[in-house]
Amino acid sequence: ESYDTTTVRASVPMWLLCKYIKENTKCRYIFSGEGSDEILGGYLYFHHAPSTEEFAYENMRRLHLIHQFDGLRADRCAGAHGLDLIVPFLDKRFIESCMSIDQNLKRDAIEKKILREAFIGYLPHEILWRQKDGMSDAVGTNWVSEVKEYTGTVIDDSLFEEIQTKCKGHNVCLSKEEAYYREQFWLMYGTDQDHLITEIWRPKWTTITDPSARLLIEKTHN
């Protein structure tokens, strides 16, 4: 129900995981970690926020849009296999508590430092303090590169330009991968439902338009 790149990329491994749980276990309730990045400013691009005020605004904006991205992905993947999703980080009391924290405590440190510190003694050090990696990046080193390669073969230059024109200025595709997802969305829902996705998930404060966290890491280190 989305043509957003990072949503589609992450949906594939989560859908497969939910399918495996349904077919190979007796579990029907699954805990999932959606929400912590939105609530605590955990995405890597937040390190580039030029001020605390802009950090705080983007923090709130990401939370308000979660139903279009990670929330949508998690709900549909679990629901498609009859699983009940439990998202502790989206508990109303947890959200209210975290959003009342001084924003400066969320900045200038490793992503979600406050949350990591809360689990000291419960998780191994190497897991607790490793750098954040996006789901679509972390499931395998080749997943994102292979899907880019595939979509580049099925969307030629002329079709890419045609799809860009059909976007009519709304969430215009910047890559052939985005164009492929947009075309599939149109085939399923028609071209008059584009507005349901108000924006494409992209990092801020950087020239990178691809949502891959690894690309942001590489640019920062270079």
What are these regions (language model features)?
Residues 1, 44-51:
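Short secondary-structure boundary/capping segments
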Residues 1-16, 20-24, 29, 71-72:
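Cysteine-dependent PTP/DSP-like catalytic domain, specifically the C-terminal lobe
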Residues 21, 47, 102:
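Active-site catalytic pocket residues across diverse enzymes, especially alpha/beta-hydrolases
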Residues 26-32, 38, 51, 55-222:
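Adenosyl-5′-phosphate
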